[in-house]
C-alpha cells in the first residue's frame, strides 16, 4: 500500500464516522412498515435487509451502533468503509463480494445470522450495475432460511455524487423516509426459474418503495 493510501486509510474512517454521526443527528426520519411488517420486531427472528447501494449513507448513519452484520469489499474503498462502520459501532464487516471470495463471505454472513445478528446487504453492490439485483442476497436467504426485507431510505434535500451508483448524501436538517416492505421468503429448494422470478420481484419491490419514499418526501405529509 502506498504512503498516500496508508495516510488516507488512517484519517478517512474517523473523519467519515464523525461526519455521518453529526449529519444524521440533524435529519428527521420517518419509518414506515417497520413495526407492522417485520416479524423480527416481536419475536427477534433475525432478518436480511436489502437496499440499493446509493442509499448507504443514510442507512449506515441512522442505524449506527446496532448489532448488524454487513459486508465490505476487499478493495481500498472497502477497507475504508469497513473501518468507518466499526467506528460507527457496527461489528466488523464480512470481507468479500459476489466477485471476490463470495462463497466464504456468504458463509460468514450466515454465521452472523445464527449468532443473533441481522444482516444488511446492497444487492447491486459493490460495483453495479446500478439497481440490478445480483444473486448473493437471494442465495444467502435461500441457504439460511432467513427472510429478506427490502428497504428504501431516501432523504430530501440531498446531493448526488458521481460514480456508478450516483450515491446520495442528505444535507443537514433534511427529511428522511425509510420504508420497509413485506419480508420475502426464498425456498431452499428453489429452481433457477424461481430464483430469476424472485430477483425480478426484489428489484420491482425496491423500485416501488424507493419511488414511494421520494413521493412522500415531496409531499407535505413527509
What are these regions (language model features)?
Residues 46-100:
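Catalytic core of membrane glycerolipid acyltransferases/transacylases, capturing the structured
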Residues 108-140, 144, 201:
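Catalytic-site beta-strand/loop segments enriched in glycine and acidic/polar residues
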Residues 77-79, 101-102, 127-129, 155-160:
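Short gly/pro/ser/thr-enriched loop/turn and capping motifs at secondary-structure boundaries
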Residues 1-33:
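A transmembrane-helix-recognition feature enriched in membrane-embedded lipid enzymes
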Residues 21-46, 52-58:
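A short, well-structured juxtamembrane/interface segment
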Residues 200-222:
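Charged phosphate-binding loop/patch that engages nucleotide di/tri-phosphates or the phosphate backbone
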Residues 132-192:
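A cross-family acyltransferase "interaction/gating" segment
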Residues 92-93, 119, 148:
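Hydrophobic beta-strand scaffold residues
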Amino acid at each position: 500500500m502506498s504512503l498516500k493510501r496508508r495516510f488516507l486509510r488512517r484519517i478517512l474512517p474517523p473523519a467519515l464516522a464523525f461526519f455521518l454521526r453529526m449529519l444524521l443527528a440533524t435529519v428527521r426520519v420517518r419509518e414506515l412498515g417497520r413495526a407492522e411488517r417485520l416479524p423480527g420486531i416481536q419475536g427477534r427472528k433475525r432478518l436480511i435487509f436489502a437496499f440499493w447501494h446509493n442509499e448507504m449513507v443514510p442507512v449506515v448513519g441512522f442505524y449506527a451502533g446496532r448489532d448488524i452484520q454487513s459486508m465490505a469489499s476487499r478493495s481500498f474503498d472497502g477497507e475504508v468503509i469497513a473501518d468507518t462502520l466499526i467506528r460507527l459501532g457496527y461489528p466488523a464487516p464480512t470481507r468479500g463480494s459476489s466477485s471476490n471470495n463470495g462463497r466464504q463471505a456468504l458463509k460468514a454472513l450466515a454465521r452472523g445470522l445464527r449468532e443473533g445478528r441481522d444482516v444488511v446487504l446492497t444487492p447491486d453492490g459493490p460495483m453495479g450495475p446500478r439497481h440490478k439485483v445480483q444473486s448473493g442476497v437471494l442465495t444467502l436467504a435461500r441457504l439460511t432460511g432467513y427472510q429478506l426485507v427490502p428497504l428504501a431510505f431516501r432523504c430530501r434535500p440531498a446531493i448526488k455524487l458521481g460514480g456508478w451508483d450516483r450515491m446520495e448524501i442528505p444535507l443537514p436538517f433534511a427529511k428522511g423516509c425509510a420504508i420497509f416492505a413485506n419480508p420475502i421468503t426464498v425456498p431452499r429448494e428453489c429452481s433457477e426459474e424461481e430464483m430469476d422470478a424472485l430477483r425480478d420481484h426484489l428489484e420491482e419491490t425496491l423500485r416501488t418503495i424507493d419511488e414511494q419514499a421520494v413521493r412522500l418526501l415531496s409531499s407535505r405529509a413527509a
